Amino acid sequence: PTTSSAASDVYKRQSEVYGKLTKSAKNQLKTKFENFFACGISIIIHPKNPMAPIFHANLRYFELYDDDNNIVDKWFGGGMDLTPFYIFKDDCIHFHSVCKKICDNYNSTFYTTFKKKCDEYFWNHHRNEARGVGGLFFDYCRENSTMSIEDWYSFVVEIGNALMDAYIPIIDKRKDLNFSHKNREWQKIRRGRYVEFNLVHDLSLIH
């Protein structure tokens, strides 16, 4: 669904899916099991003011089952990132500081690791340019010696709730700034690059 206001267009998608993995999906996941459950939520906010950046977040959970319907594997994935049309250094610092604060609550290596994955993933290879200024990206986050599945759930919930701390203060500063027709034209070009990434490189849309 889409909600629209004078300030922005907000695209939200949430879903729960049951089914059987395709052969290519089984090969990609390197599993012999095919029964699965997946759920997730995706949020994209496109401000109408070119001085305000695009916000994107995606959070998901995946389970695999054997023939007796026992869970044999489960993991979390997702992230959030920022795509400005015009760079304000303070906004970038603020967004990443919130990302780092959340990560540091769980593991001091998370921010560096997940930021690097975000920079690598959200890259328009055919133009050799970044889609935005990054954020966090993580996937296949399974229970391990330092993080239980409940810990991963708490981490993902914090990422989801971070919209209020990471993004809203930026919008409050930028949504009423003056802009020109030239600024709007540049915004359209950068939105076009955003669409290019989604159509050419985004694995969640390609597969």
Predicted regions and their residues:
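Compact, glycine/acidic-enriched structural inserts
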Residues: D66-T113
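Single conserved hydrophobic/aromatic residue that forms the stacking wall/gate
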Residues: P1-A7, Y11, H207
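Short, flexible loop/turn elements at secondary-structure junctions
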Residues: E16-Y18, S42-N49, Y61-E63, P84-Y86, ...
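Long, charged, mostly alpha-helical binding arms that flank functional sites
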Residues: K101-F155, A166-D172
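Extended, compositionally biased non-globular segments
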Residues: S145-S204
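Glycine-rich, often proline-containing surface loops adjacent to acidic residues and nearby aromatics
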Residues: F37-G40, D73-T83, E129-E150, Y194-E196
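Long, hydrophobic/aromatic-enriched structural stretches that serve as scaffold segments
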Residues: D9-Y61
